[in-house]
């Protein structure tokens, strides 16, 4: 299933997905496959805040501070289980893209991602990623840029 690529094509975004059979499930794996700094990898982390999903886009070099995410979300947060993550985004954990989700999901973006010329994010599967400028990522994901790193 290449649903995210179909979504990208229909949206006419001109973004190219790259596949890596060795996998891009973790930030380190993705950075190694792409040949970039781990800080340029976008981790799309799905949480539940007050019964609704939220997505945190975090630099691969950073750990998320769940208290900071809860503060910006305005509700306590818990990590989404695999079923909740798929229901909210349409994708399995390890391949969740930063936008193009199945439902309207609030997105919060780690400020550190803006410090890179380009970043790489999951493209719907645990073996594929795409390159994008961080400002364009913010715009397309409708993300609120915040300090959410630990």
Regions found by a protein language model. Give the residues of each.
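Extended, low-hydrophobicity, polar/charged segments
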Residues: 1-150
């Amino acid at each position: 299933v290449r649903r995210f690529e179909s979504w990208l094509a229909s949206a006419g975004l001109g973004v190219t997905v790259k596949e890596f059979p060795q996998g891009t499930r973790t930030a380190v794996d993705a950075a190694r496959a792409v040949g970039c700094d781990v800080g340029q990898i976008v981790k799309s982390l799905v949480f539940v805040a007050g019964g609704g999903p939220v997505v945190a886009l975090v630099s691969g070099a950073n750990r998320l501070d769940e208290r900071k995410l809860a503060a910006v979300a305005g509700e306590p947060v818990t990590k989404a289980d695999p079923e909740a993550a798929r229901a909210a985004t349409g994708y399995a954990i390890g391949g969740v893209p930063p936008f193009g989700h199945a439902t309207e999901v609030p997105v919060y973006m780690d400020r550190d991602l803006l410090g890179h010329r380009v970043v790489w994010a999951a493209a719907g599967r645990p073996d594929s990623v795409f390159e994008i400028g961080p400002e364009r990522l913010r715009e397309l994901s409708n993300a609120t840029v915040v300090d959410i790193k630990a």
